Each structure stands twice: as C-alpha cells, then as structure tokens.
Amino acid sequence: VNMGINGASTNLSLGAIDNYQRFLNKPVLGPAATTEILAIPEIWQKRAFSILDLSKFQFAAGQSFDAEFVGRDPVLLLGENPISVDYFGLQVLTLAREKRGMKARKPEDVLIFRYAKELGLGDVKDAKLFDLP
C-alpha cells in the first residue's frame, strides 16, 4: 500500500480483512482504509500492542522486494498505539533513505498520520519513545 510506511497500522487493519487488494496502489484510499478500519471500536478497543521489527526492513522501491534497499537495525519497536509505532519506524526508514542520498519521508506527508489524528486515533506529535536496555 502506498502509505509512506507499511508497518504496524497496515498489519493490524488491512491484515484483518479479506479483500485488502483493492486498496493496493491507492495513494489516498489505502491510508484512508487503514485508519478507518483501525477506528472501528471492535478493533481499536481490543488492541493490546504492536511490534515493529527493524532487524530487516525495506526503505525504498515500494511493495516489491528489492535487496538493494534493505536496511538493518537491531531494534524492536513496541507500543500500544500502532500509529505511534509506525511514526518511530518511519524515522528509521528516513535515516536509511538519507544515508543513500534519497528524499526523506516526512511525517506530515504520510497520510495515515493525518487521518489518524482526524479520527482521534492519536497525534504523532504526542508520541513518546522510551529506550529500554
């Protein structure tokens, strides 16, 4: 899904439906569907936590695997809010992109963050990161 980041939010929302293919390659519909599905009370109120494993991630080239754009960071992001988890994941992807001379992905350009705020799922500006040993 063309959302800037395909992580915890996408996994919890589009991963919960059968016909997710209709949202692929839709730059506005994909993020809208992701956040609207997350906002369903039966999903949002029952979530426990989200994990984003950054031991291996792809930071460019879209949905198709491309080994040229695989990064590694020995970090697990764990959080109650999948939107916040994706926000911190995006920071890691952005660093990898910048190291390769690619355009950074800014949180304000990622529609799932904007839509999540509008739907009351959280504002990434309020997200906090705690580093645990």
Predicted regions located by residue number:
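Extended, low-polarity segments enriched in aliphatic/aromatic residues
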Residues: 1-133
